[in-house]
Every structure is written in C-alpha cells, then in structure tokens.
Amino acid sequence: MAPAVASGAMATDPRVDAYLSKLPDDQQRLLDGVRRRVAELAPDAVETISYGMPAYKVDGRFFLSYAAWKKHCSIYPIDDGLLDRHADAVRGYGRTKGALHFTPQQPLPDALLKDLVRQRVTEARARSGY
C-alpha cells in the first residue's frame, strides 16, 4: 500500500493508522504523540510497517520504529549503541537490546525523542550515501 503524502508533510501509511486504532486509548495517545513528533523532526521520512510495527526511513534506510505491548510501549532506534550513549537520559526506563520501554505514566522526554530521531536520521543518511 502506497503511503499518503500531504504537501510539506511526512509521507504517512494508512496501515499505521490501523495499527494505532487497535490500541487502548492511553497507548494510542502515547504512540500518536511519538508519530507526530517524528513527522515534525523528519518531515521527509517515509512511514511504513516493518515487522508488524510502525517504522520510519529516510533515503531508503530505516532509522526508528515503535510498538505497543501489553504493559508498555517500546521505541527501537535501530542502533544498539545509541541508547548506551544516552545512558543518563534513559536511566529509570526499562530496556532490552535495542529497545527503550515507556508507558503513559512514564512517557519519553521530548528532548530524548528529539535527540534519538535527529541522530538516527543523520546516521541513516550517512550510511545511504546521500
């Protein structure tokens, strides 16, 4: 399914709308906030579904994905070392390899999300050769 593109906006994918619509209200609001912030920070990104979860790419390279789980949401910056480099900022959040867990009661700080998105976009572009 081709992503929809509004003038001056990030290309969006209706499958992400469907993914979010199936979530409980609190997770839906939380992940919609992540989605909106990614769109603001990376307006030329393409939104898609990869491995059953919303994902974003620039210049053909994935840079971020997220998912809802039973007890938390996760953001996957697709760079295991990036979360280690933000050790102070992610202290107190649950983590698994390559994922940062957050909840409606403990959302991601905007500054952290901004840093993760910007760094991953920069890294993805550097690897794509553009």
Residue ranges and their predicted role:
Residues 1-130:
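Charge-dense, helix-prone N-terminal extensions
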